[in-house]
Structures are given as structure tokens and as C-alpha cells.
Amino acid sequence: MTAALHTSALTSLPLLARGKVRDNYAVGQDRLLMVASDRLSAFDVILGEPIPGKGALLTQMALFWFAKLGHLCPNHLTGEAPESVVTAAELPQVTGRSMLVKRLKPLPVEAVVRGYLAGSGWKEYQESQSVCGVPLPAGLKNAGKLPEPIFTPAAKAEVGEHDENISYEQVEKVVGPELAAQIKKISIEIYKTAAAFALTKGIIIADTKFEFGLDENGTLTLMDEVLTPDSSRYWPIEGYEAAYAAGLNPPSYDKQFVRDWLEAVRINGKPWDKTPPSPQLPPDVVAKTAAKYQEALTRLAG
């Protein structure tokens, strides 16, 4: 296996930003080189231990979905090889884990779509029988399928800050009613199409998060990563029914595995408070997480 890349260090291009997972470099005025590192974040904290091969797997999965969903919405890919804009010495940091994309005006909204009740959505439902202001029927259970997918947006947070759930009305205030309606419609459409396909491969996509930007003509464009285990809850169909019947979280292909370990770990007898620094992941958790990412891609695209 190739060595894990926690942080890229390209010198031939100006670094614009480091996100939780991706390092973005400027390529002229109108393009970006997005390098997917092997960093893992959980609870909006970047963990110290990289997951070997994760960046390449995320990139392959995003490219798979961009190709499959291209008819629904324009995306940020330029179609050019990322390797063409770096030096020969920098190729090992870029090959297989990068995308050369259009530079867009990012919209400050995380477009979250939920098809099942899980995570923070389940917690909120128990308190208010709604999620992000969307009222839901009584009697739903943890990991239960919703009658219809719901759009539950979040305000995009700075690195290290927690994304904050917001109402649809707040989205309208931020981007305007017309764009808000477009984001909601296309997000639900993409989710439904992807979830139906994934189901044929034995995978339930419980929820997912999209990011959009506007191009120079003001066209809504899908950007960043799409439908990866970092931005979505992936559940194998095996084990789902038993977990649902027991009211438990189903086994997953995403970083829920790491989240569960972090929730259970004790530091000096106390739970981790979800602020940096994070507890050190044991090698077996790193290895199992890497295997989960690989299995998800193999199953989906195989």
C-alpha cells in the first residue's frame, strides 16, 4: 500500500486553503487543483492519524458519481488531467487522488438530504418530531426510512467549527428564494437517483450532503465531493433489518465506525469532549476504516 498522505505540500502552485480532507491549490485564475488527502475528520475535528488510501478511494468514488449523475446537474470537473499542472516531482502527491476543477463561487449552504432517520436527525426527531423544521410523522424509529427524502440544510462552518442546521427559510434569506428552490429540488433528485442505484448494489444511502457553487454565468454547479462515505451514511443492506428492529445504528461503510469508537473511548475516565486534540486511533481502527472505504467502492463500482 502506498504511504498515507496526511498533508500535501505542492510548491509549484499557490495553496488557497486546507479543508478537513482536501487541499486546494490555484491553477491560474479560473481553476483549482483539489488534492484529497488521507486525513479523516470526525465531529468536525481533524484526527491525527491518516487512513491509508482514503484520498484515492474518495476521489474514485466522487468521479464515479459525477459520471453517473452528470445528466441531472452540471459539475465542477474540467475533464483535464490533474497531473498536467504539477511538476514531475509532485506527481506522487497528486496521482489518483486529485481533481482539476472549475473555480466557482461557493454557496454557503450544505445541501443535506435525508432518506432515513439517523444521527443528529434522530436526536432532533425525538425532541421535536421534526428535523430542521420539517415536521415528520409520529412513531418513526432510529434508522427508519422516511416516507419521502427531506431537505435539511446546514450553514457551512469554518474548519474546526460545527456545521449548524438551518431552516429552509434561512436558506432563502442567504441565497434567495429562486436559488434555494433549485438547490432543494436538484439535491433531492440527485439523492433519489443515487440511492436507487446504490440499492441495486446492496447499499443503503441513508443521507448525504452536497455542495454547490455558481459558475461565471450564474449556473448552479455541483462541486467538492459527491456521495462519498465522508459526506454520506452508507449502510450495507445485510444487517440493516436486524439493527432497525433492535433500534440500533446499522453497520456502516462510512466513518461512523470511527465515530462510534470515539464516542466509547475514555480519557482519564471521561468521554472525549470533541475538541482538538483527538484521541489517537489504534492501528486496528485505522485498518478497519481503510477496509470499509475500499469495500464500499468495490461494491458500488464493481
UniProtKB/Swiss-Prot annotation:
GO terms for biological process: 'de novo' IMP biosynthetic process. One of its GO terms (molecular function) is phosphoribosylaminoimidazolesuccinocarboxamide synthase activity. It catalyses: 5-amino-1-(5-phospho-D-ribosyl)imidazole-4-carboxylate + L-aspartate + ATP = (2S)-2-[5-amino-1-(5-phospho-beta-D-ribosyl)imidazole-4-carboxamido]succinate + ADP + phosphate + 2 H(+). Pathway: Purine metabolism; IMP biosynthesis via de novo pathway; 5-amino-1-(5-phospho-D-ribosyl)imidazole-4-carboxamide from 5-amino-1-(5-phospho-D-ribosyl)imidazole-4-carboxylate: step 1/2. Its EC number is 6.3.2.6. Keywords: ATP-binding, Ligase, Nucleotide-binding, Purine biosynthesis. It holds the Pfam family SAICAR_synt. It is an enzyme of class 6 (ligase). InterPro entries: SAICAR_synt/ADE2_N, SAICAR_synth, SAICAR_synthetase_CS. Signal peptide: none annotated. GO terms for cellular component: cytoplasm. PANTHER family: PHOSPHORIBOSYLAMINOIMIDAZOLE-SUCCINOCARBOXAMIDE SYNTHASE. Belongs to the SAICAR synthetase family. This is Phosphoribosylaminoimidazole-succinocarboxamide synthase. It comes from Polaromonas sp. (strain JS666 / ATCC BAA-500).
